[in-house]
C-alpha cells in the first residue's frame, strides 16, 4: 500500500450521477402519479395502499444508512466478527413488534405513534414523548455528515450537503409513496456498492479462505465470548440483549418505521413486510462483516488510521475502495453512490416522519384547516426539517465514532419510549401517572449513563480493541512507522458509569417499566372502563400467540372485516370500551 491519494475520475462522476439520477427518476415518477392526492394523510401514509415487498425493502433501506455502510465494517475491523450476533436480535425484535405493537397501531390507523400515548395515557405523556423523538434530529445529522467522511477520500471538495435538495424534492412532490419506491431502488444501489468491494477483495486475495485465515490469525473470528460482564463492549449477551431492546425500540416505537408498516394495504402485508425486512437486515449485516474482514486482510500490517492516513475509522472502507478500485473506472463512483443513496434513504425517512409527527401532534389538534392547506403545511414542514437536519450535520462531527454515537442517541431516545409503549400495550393496570413518570425516570436513567460514559469513558480493558499494526507501512509522504496496538489485559478497576453502549437502551427501557408499574400501584390501577378501545393487549393472549407463532389479531373484532382500520379509528374516538 503506497499511501498515495487517489481521486475520482470523470467516469466515476458519471456513474455517480447516473445512479443517483435513476433514484431521483423513480421518486419523480411516483410523485407525478400521486400529484392529485388531496389530503395530508395520503401525503404522509401513501394512502395505505402499499404492498409488503416494497415496504419491507423500504424498512431495510431506511436503517441501512450511510452510518451503517461505513461504520459496521470499521466496527468489525477493530472489534471482530462477533458483531454478527446482532442478527439474532433482528429476529427477536421483529417477532416482538409484529405480535405486540403492530396489531394495536395498525388497528388504530394512527398517523403518529404518539397519538396512541394520548389515547392510552395523557396529553402530557404524548407531548413529552414527541419532544424525545425530535432529539433524533441528531441521528439524521450523523447520516448527513457520514457521506462527507467518505467523499473526502475520493473528491477534492465536500458535496454531501447537496443531497438534501434531492430528498426534499421527492418529499415535497410525492410524500411517503415516493420515498418508499425510491428506497427500493436505493437499497439495490447500496448492495451493489458493497458487492463491488467484496468481490474485488476476494479476487486480489486469491479467495475468501485467505481473508478468513488472516482474520483468524488476527483474532477477528471471535464468536466464542459469552462473558456476562455488562461493562464489556461486545459479547454475545450485550449484542443479543442490547440489540433486541434497541431494534424493538426502532420497529415498535420509532415513527419512521411504524409509519411504513402502517402504510400497508392490510395487516397481513404489514406483518409480512416486517419479516421480509429481517432478511434484508441479515444480508446487510453479513455484507458489513465480510467487508470488515476484508479491511483487516488488507491492512493487517499497516493500519491507515494509526498511520494518520485517515482521520476516523469510518473512513477506512472508502480508503480501501480508492486503493483497490482506482484502476477500475466507474466502480469507485458506484461505491460512493451507494454511500450517498444510504444517506438519502434515511434522511428522507426521517424528514417525512418528523413532518407527520408535527402535523398530527401539534397542528391538527389545535387548528382546523382544510385538507388543501394541511397538505401545503405538510410539504412546508418537510422543507423546514430538511434545513434543520443539514444544520445538525455540523454537530455530528463532534460526536466521535459514528456507530457508538448512533447507539447512544438510540439509547437515550429509544429506551424510555420502548418502556413506555410496552407498558401501554402489555400492562392494563398502568395509569397515566405511571406512564408519565416512568418515561421521565427512563429518560433520566438513560441520560445519566450517557453522561457517565462521557465523563468516564470505558477503558480499553472493557472495549478490547483488537491488535492493529503499522510496522508494514511504507508511505511516500513520510518516514517508516512501527506502531503496534497491544492486546488488552484484564481490567484492574470496573466503573458502573460505563456499561456497554448497547445497554443504554436496556437501562432506559427497564427503568421506565419498573417505575411506571410502581407509580401505578401506588396511585391506583387503571380501570377497564377507562381504556380507549384497541389500546391494550392482554399479556396472557400476547404470550400464547407469540409462543405459538400465530397472529395476535384475534383479540380484536375483525381488523379487516368491519370496515377496515379507518372505520375502526372513527369508532375508537367515540368509545372507551377495553378490548381485553
Pin down the residues of each PLM region:
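Membrane-embedded helix-loop-helix hairpins and adjacent transmembrane boundary segments
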Residues: 1-580
